[in-house]
């Protein structure tokens, strides 16, 4: 596989030796910002002494530089975001995206593709933000079905005519939103298959005279590119089962004729693009939370009107970390963001407790953070067992002082807690359904689970204990979980029927339970206690 990519780049370089006139386009791209436009600390670089990140104000400085660079060279410039712009920080969440869209207006974004988290608090929020945006809001595969008529919820595409070349950008939102959002929040919305939608709008843009077609997708590049590519080849060999794509890697394999793709949804940055070895589409993706900006200069042959190569602006690759000492914060943008931050963060920086150790999400089956959260859920609701989904747990907590701001960053979604009486057999079936595809995607408390991945589906939970004893199939247990899972999201369809029949919903916010738990038990020191063990786990 790596050999094939090397051959492709050798051929690409050889082709550039006999070029005619060329023209360049610089693209700056962000994804999964999740409200991260304010300043923050780069704890992922150095947990003990983190460098300062300038957020949107540092991005504004870099964007201004890139625009000037393009102007002096006569190049084109394009600024894109591929979704999940606001939900995740106080600045983003408390303003319901207003502060983020104002920032995007100020720095001159060309387009924003709707992400699944845009619908976390209802469709009215993205609808309002679309009216505030001075740029195109894209999604070719979301349809409003109100009144039985299918109409586009957002614009399907953007066409930019640079004179030298006409470039079309088609936006795609993950159809998995229907599994990840509350049903009420996406009422009367239809998410069409990504594969057929992208193919159709590729043809539309070509018919409208676009020389270059760019796909901007809120459908991500995977964490492990080689494992995922093996899966793509396997699925292709077996025959595609639907018109929905599992990830961007599959999408570009199934839809040829896309010149460039920018991805989002999965928070892993690719310093160098993934290039599909069959269709040769380069795919780019950055890290999330506004920590970086992706910047690439693409070169096109004006005779063939084809992409002939690209280059980065730094040796490390395409992703530029927005450190404030390297990119001083733009004063005007900084003032706008800091004013909002000062208003929404009042009281959120007060001390509520301490942690003896860093509380991280690291771990295949359990983690310090997951154990803390589920233990807090169990404590608050006086349950027997507790479960929550890993996807709702967004960051780590450093050692030392803990504030409400820290807890909010970990749990930015307004999930509430509920309880339901279930049998031991139901708990086991619930877990079996979650491990059928490998990992569980769950954090738990009150139980000890042992999973053997090598066993057939439905038989992988080889040990389940509650109260330190083997689970009794027909005994009743009080299960604590979130309203999100009680609706059947994140693969928990088995819970959906119980919500209306037997669930008791408290209205207590999940993060408030964690706040109270930390206050009550401070200083805290969560431990890994073997509550979730996986045999045959991949390293």
Q: Residue spans of the language-model regions?
A:
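Feature captures C-terminal
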Residues: 24-26, 36, 49, 54, ...
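Positively charged n-region of N-terminal signal peptides that target proteins for export
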Residues: 1-4
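Bacterial N-terminal signal peptides
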Residues: 6-15
